[in-house]
Amino acid sequence: MLKVAVYWGCVIPAVQYAYEMSVREVLPKLGVEIVDLEDVSCCGNPLQSVNTFASLYLSARNMAIAEKTGLNDLLILCNGCHLSFSEAKHFLNTDEKLRQKVNSLLNDEGLQYKGSLKIWHLVDFLHDAIGKETIRKTLKNPLDGLKVASHYGCHIIRPSTLGRVDDAEDPRKMDELIEWLGAKSIDYSEKLDCCGAVLLLSHPDAALTFAGLKMKAVQGLGVDGFVDTCPSCHMMFDMRQKSVGATVGAKLDVPVIYYTQLLGVAMGIENEKLGLHLNRSPIDELLHKIA
């Protein structure tokens, strides 16, 4: 078994626990042992515009806790958390004075940031570390004939200067992950558009419009479902689908599903174990087509 430290963040265990449920079901079947981290905190992302150092420090602290396990790999499921950790690692590994300042504070907790971790997002972890052959061997119910649209989200592909999960202009890894399950990932012009979540508190109408226009475009494709991997994006498209539809004057009925839920269905895992009963969009239509 490949042992991997997993950072769940705040949103997943507090609100989007269907994501956690599905991840805990599918990873062991792929030969991955999940190591939960104790005493971790928020990644720091919400603090960036208020206190940049505090934001960076929280990411550094969480990575130091992960390093203390002795593991080499840290898996992050939230796009925003992944960007926060990646930015912190970049700055700490290139600025010795900043690193010393952070470590002097971490020392009070018996922690030290070393910069030794390989930071993964779910998408590149499954695509690059696990791979097609391993995933396909676990499938009991291939999704042949299913047509879906993918959503990468902004933070795992931008900024490209940090070395992100996939190409910022033409990402393919998530689409390939979908097609390894037997489904068809449909390309569309709005594929890289933002979900709007970052604007929800400051400019709610703009946020809902972003999500609504993208969902309206996806519905026009005639696909069977919409696949994502970020909890914040998922809340915009799944939990708030009625609201975003009303904002753009559209009645939306797009089934929205996490990739790990879709993978779990293809593995033959029971729907409830994957948290599919917690999805707010009309997921039954998608599940009926798979069955």
Place the predicted regions along the sequence by residue.
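Iron-sulfur cluster-binding electron-transfer modules in prokaryotic oxidoreductases
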Residues: M1-A291
